Amino acid sequence: MANLKSARHRKAAYDSSLQLANALGAGANKIKKQIRNVERLLAKKRDTLPDTVIVEKERTLEALRLELASAEKRALARKNAKKYHMVRFFERKKATRRYKQALKKVETSAGDDAALTDLRQRELELCYVVNFPKTTKYIALYPVEEDPEAAKETAAKRDAFLKVVAKQLSEGTLPVPLEQILKGKKLNKESTGISVSDSEDEEEPGRNEEAHEEEEDDFFE
C-alpha cells in the first residue's frame, strides 16, 4: 500500500513538472487551459486525492498563475513595442540630436554650469526614450499640442517616469546604460524596460483591452 502511495506521489510530481515545463514560455491561452485543468481536477477529486497530490497540484496551480502573469506581460510588451515603434524612433533621433548639441556646447564653453546642466538633462531624456517600459502606454517627451487639462495629467505621468529613469541612471541600473545608448544599443526583445513600480503606472496585463484599443492612434500623449 505504501509503495502504491509512493508511486502515485511520484506520478503526480512528474505530471506537475511536465505541466510547468510545457507552460514555460508558452502563450497565455495555453497556460489558462492548463490552469483550468488543474482547477477542475481539484474541484472534482479533492475528497479522494491523497494530501500529497493535492499539495503538489496546488503548488502547480500557483506556479502556473505566476507564469500566466509573465506571459500576459510579455504579450503586452510585444504589442506596445509594435504600437509605439515609430514615435519612439523619431523621439530617439530628436533626443540624440539634442544630446549632441548640448555636448558640443559643453566642449566649447569651458565648463559653463548652465551648459553642463543642459547636458545632464539631455542625457536623461535620451535614457528615458530608450528605457521607457514596454508594458505601459508610451508618454512622449516632445508631445504635440493637446487639451490643457489632459496635458497636466500627462506631464505628471511623464515627470514620474523621468524620476525613475533619473534614479536608475544615477545608480547605474538602467536596462540600457547611457554609454550603450550612445553606441546605438536599445532594449532587446526580452527586456521590458525600466521597472515602473516606483511610478505606479504600469498597465495590468489583460485588463480592459477595449479601452486600450481606443488609444491605438494616440501616440503623442
From Swiss-Prot:
Source species, domain of life: Eukaryota
CC per GO annotation: nucleolus; preribosome, small subunit precursor
Pfam family, one: Efg1
Region (Disordered): 189-221
Keyword terms, alphabetized: Coiled coil, Nucleus, rRNA processing
Coiled coil: 28-81
Cell location: Nucleus, Nucleolus
Biased composition (Acidic residues): 211-221
Signal keyword on record: no
GO biological process per UniProt: maturation of SSU-rRNA from tricistronic rRNA transcript (SSU-rRNA, 5.8S rRNA, LSU-rRNA); nuclear RNA surveillance; re-entry into mitotic cell cycle after pheromone arrest
Entry keyword annotation includes Nucleus: yes
Stated role: Involved in rRNA processing.
Name of the protein described by the UniProt record: rRNA-processing protein EFG1
Gene from which this protein is expressed: EFG1
